[in-house]
Amino acid sequence: MNLSEISYRRVVVKLGTSVLTSGSLKLDKAHMVELARQMACLMKAGVEVVLCTSGAIAAGKEHLGYPQLPDTIASKQLLAAVGQSQLILAWSQLFSIYGLHVGQLLLTRADLHDRERYLNARDSLNALLNNGIIPIINENDAVATAEIKVGDNDNLSARAALLCDADLLILLTDQKGLFDADPRKNPDAKLITEVQNIDDSLRMLAGGAVSGLGTGGMATKLEAADIARRAGVEVVIASGHHKDVIQNVVCAKPVGTHFTALEHPLESRKQWILAGPKARGQVVLDTGAITAVTQKGRSLLSKGIIEVNGLFQRGDTIELVDTKGKVYAKGMSRYGSLDVSKIAGKHSDNIEEILGYDYGDAVVHRNDMVVL
C-alpha cells in the first residue's frame, strides 16, 4: 500500500454477520482471512484499526452443531457466550499470521450510559491502540438484556468511533451501499455515492432495506452514520465482498456510499449525550419551543412544554419531540418527569413557587442538548 494514498489514520471497521458468513449458516473462514489481511496491511502502513465484529451467535451455532433451541433470549445468550470465544479465537489466530495481537472489549449500553464507565472504556480502547494492539469490539450479548443493549453493531461501531476519536467508520454489509431504491426489487436502482445531509427522505429510503442475517439493516447503518458524522467522523457503507474494499476506502477511492462529516463536530460531552445514555422519556414541545431550540440555539424552558411521556429522574437523558413524535433534540433534563409535568406550560419565574425549589430556568439547558 502506498502511504501517500492513505487519507485516514484511525479507522473503525464494522463487519456484519452477512459479511462474515457470506450468507451461509457458518463463519466463512476464507473470507475472514482476506479481511484480516486487509486490516493487517493498514496496521503495517501506520493506520490504527478497531474491529467491531458481529457473528458470535453464528459461531456459537456452528460450534455446538446447530442445536435445536427454543427461540428465547436465554438461547441467544447461550449461543453468544459459546460463540464469542470462538470468534475472538478465530480473529486472534488470523491476525497472529501478521504478527499482530488483539484485545477483546465486550460492551453494553450500561458501559456507555454512565459517564465514568464511558471514559474508562475510552481509556481501555486507546491503551490498546497506543500499543499496536487491534481492539475487537462486540456487544456483550451473553449478559445484555433489552434494557441495556445497544441493539446492533452498527450503532455500537459508531459509538466505538466516538470513543477512540476515529476519523473514519467503515460499515461493511452485503449491499454495495445505499441505493435510491431497493436493488433487490428494482433493477434500475442507483447507488448513492455521496451523502452530505441525512434527512427524513433518506431515512425513509433506508427503512425497508434489511440484510439477510443479523440484527442490522440499512436503517441502523444510517443511524450509525448520523451519530458518527455529527462527531466529525466520516462514514462509508460498502460491500464486504468488494475486492480490497477496506484498503480502497481508506485510500479514498470511490467505493460504496460516503457520508461527509460535519464541518463543526460536537464537543466531547455532547458526543456522549448523543451516543451514550438511553433516552428515559420525552417532552412534547409547542412550535415556538421547537423553533427556539432548533433554529435559535436556545435552552428548553418549561413554558414551551405541552406534555411529558415516560418516567425519568433529574439528570436523565430525554428526547424533545413534537406532537407527532418526531425527535428534534436530545438532552439531559434538570428536572424529573413528575416535576416537569407540574411546570409544563408555566413561566420559568413560577417554578420555585410551584415546586418549592428550582434548578434554574431551563428544563434542558442548551449546553446539555444535542439538536438532531
Curated annotation (Swiss-Prot):
GO terms for molecular function: ATP binding; glutamate 5-kinase activity; RNA binding. Pfam families: AA_kinase (PF00696), PUA (PF01472). GO terms for biological process: L-proline biosynthetic process. The keyword ATP-binding applies. GO terms for cellular component: cytosol. InterPro entries: AceGlu_kinase-like_sf, Asp/Glu/Uridylate_kinase, G5K_ProB, Glu/AcGlu_kinase, Glu_5kinase, Glu_5kinase/COase_Synthase, Glutamate_5-kinase_CS, PUA. Pathway: Amino-acid biosynthesis; L-proline biosynthesis; L-glutamate 5-semialdehyde from L-glutamate: step 1/2. The keyword Cytoplasm applies. Keywords: Amino-acid biosynthesis, ATP-binding, Cytoplasm, Kinase, Nucleotide-binding, Proline biosynthesis, Transferase. Its EC number is 2.7.2.11. Gene3D superfamilies: Acetylglutamate kinase-like, PUA domain. Its main location: cytoplasm. It catalyses: L-glutamate + ATP = L-glutamyl 5-phosphate + ADP. It is found in: Cytoplasm. Residues 280-358 form the PUA domain. Substrate binds at S54, D141, N153. ATP binds at K14, T173, D174, T215, G216, G217, M218, A219, T220, K221. It is an enzyme of class 2 (transferase). NCBIfam families: proB. PANTHER family: GLUTAMATE 5-KINASE, ISOPENTENYL PHOSPHATE KINASE. Catalyzes the transfer of a phosphate group to glutamate to form L-glutamate 5-phosphate. HAMAP family: ProB. Belongs to the glutamate 5-kinase family. This is Glutamate 5-kinase. It comes from Shewanella halifaxensis (strain HAW-EB4). The gene is proB.
